[in-house]
């Protein structure tokens, strides 16, 4: 259900705005999106796992907050990010 360290490192290098960047909204949203996609696949097999579903809703909420922040600060970066990740907003 969690993402591997190699996948997380690949996401960081792909969405980083500068070298060593792990805290930018783009990187955080990319990592959260990967975790959300993994959990969504988990629920196809485990429909009654309500404990993990609550965690999924928490992840979606924090991703939405980061996306709202990014849209408020720099709308061009926001539209580029949601296009790259394929997020419907």
UniProtKB/Swiss-Prot annotation:
Keyword rRNA-binding in annotation: yes
GO BP, sorted A to Z: translation
SMART domains: Ribosomal_S15 (SM01387)
Keyword rRNA-binding in record: yes
PROSITE patterns documented for this protein: RIBOSOMAL_S15
Keywords tagged on the record: Ribonucleoprotein, Ribosomal protein, RNA-binding, rRNA-binding
Signal sequence, renumbered to the chain: none
GO MF term (any one): rRNA binding
GO cellular component annotations of the record: cytosolic small ribosomal subunit
InterPro entries, A to Z: Ribosomal_uS15, Ribosomal_uS15_bac-type, uS15_NS1_RNA-bd_sf
Chain segments annotated as coiled-coil in the UniProt record: none
Domain of life: Bacteria
Function in brief: One of the primary rRNA binding proteins, it binds directly to 16S rRNA where it helps nucleate assembly of the platform of the 30S subunit by binding and bridging several RNA helices of the 16S rRNA.
Family the UniProt entry places it in: Belongs to the universal ribosomal protein uS15 family.
Name assigned to this protein: Small ribosomal subunit protein uS15
Species in which this protein is naturally found: Agrobacterium fabrum (strain C58 / ATCC 33970) (Agrobacterium tumefaciens (strain C58))
